[in-house]
């Protein structure tokens, strides 16, 4: 079972980097009140920790989006399931994401937000899986550059499980979970896996 998962990022490494991102946002938005927009559900744990590291006034909003597969359309069709109700015109908005890979969903969301006459719009992502990018996305605040592997934990899920893990784990082969959906649960019950190579910190 040693091939079920390995640690990509330990809790301590995540918290250190989140603190650095929070301090950067604090400095960049001094004298302003940014609005952090979290995308449900994956970004909630990252958002909660990030908020604690921002040393100034800040507001929070939530959105939920979904992507539906469509054979004639690469990446599928995106739909907003839960929108922001109040007017954000003139506000400084930071979209908080757990992970950005192809950029298709985020690109749709950013285009939607830009139509609201914002004062400014930036992106803060814990993980950037840039080698999967299809649509160019400018991410001002990046936690780590993520390898091209499936990851779970710290808000990231597989079939709604494992969001509550304080670490981020790599699942090298999805075939294991396809044949046994409980394989990772069984593995974790015996203790967390050994540390693997960490993701790269974005400088």
Regions found by a protein language model. Give the residues of each.
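PRPP-associated nucleotide enzymes
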Residues: 1-203
